[in-house]
């Protein structure tokens, strides 16, 4: 409720999302919760989840190496905690919120030679932020900040499929089937363009690598 914003600093406490996550884990592993260390042992997959430490204003990475005993559900709950919409998460005496506040496109943690990044970008050319409430101001600022962060890190990987002309709000959770199909078609369009341009991208990447090696040798 709106009263929850003033009492607990967010509209939703995220309990429903946690219930859904627990159901998935119960169905997959027949347990109610799972730590990063347990997940890695069972799957041999290195899961990284980004959160923002609001208390100390820094980006943190949750994984089986950094936080082996942390609940994966807690990490996911942190990563989805959009300010105002969800209450912050108290973990290790610090408050945490959505990782996108500090890094909305954490491609830097991936192998840039083997990772394909999908970057769904709002079209700022058609952006028309309006102020109708305190929430609209917060969301507008969050979108601007996130777009700036994205541009800062996007050069770190040559294999990024950038999907432009996306015109939906980041907190629009009520997607219709028609909207989902339009987004899929948009992704297919830009994926084909990416594949067509890939040989040129690879050549440029190789040339840049050679230049870097020569400069380092000199």
How should each PLM-predicted stretch be described?
Residues 1-218:
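Patatin-like phospholipase
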């Amino acid at each position: 409720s709106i009263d929850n914003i003033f009492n607990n600093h967010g509209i939703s406490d995220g309990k429903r999302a946690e219930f859904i996550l627990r159901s998935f884990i119960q169905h997959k592993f027949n347990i109610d919760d799972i730590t990063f260390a347990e997940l890695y042992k069972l799957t041999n997959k290195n899961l990284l989840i980004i959160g923002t430490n609001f208390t100390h204003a820094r980006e943190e990475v949750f994984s089986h190496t950094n936080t082996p005993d942390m609940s994966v559900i807690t990490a996911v709950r942190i990563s989805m905690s959009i300010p105002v919409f969800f209450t912050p998460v108290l973990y290790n005496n610090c408050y945490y919120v959505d990782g996108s506040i500090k890094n909305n496109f954490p491609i830097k943690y991936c192998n840039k030679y083997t990772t394909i990044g999908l970057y769904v970008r709002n079209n700022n050319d058609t952006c028309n932020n309006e102020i109708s409430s305190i929430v609209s101001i917060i969301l507008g600022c969050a979108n601007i900040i996130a777009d700036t962060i994205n541009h800062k890190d996007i050069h770190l990987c040559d294999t990024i499929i950038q999907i432009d002309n996306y015109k939906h709000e980041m907190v629009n959770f009520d997607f219709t089937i028609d909207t989902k199909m339009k987004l899929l078609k948009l992704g297919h369009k830009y994926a084909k363009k990416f594949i067509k341009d890939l040989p040129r991208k690879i050549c440029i990447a190789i040339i840049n690598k050679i230049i870097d090696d020569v400069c380092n040798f000199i």
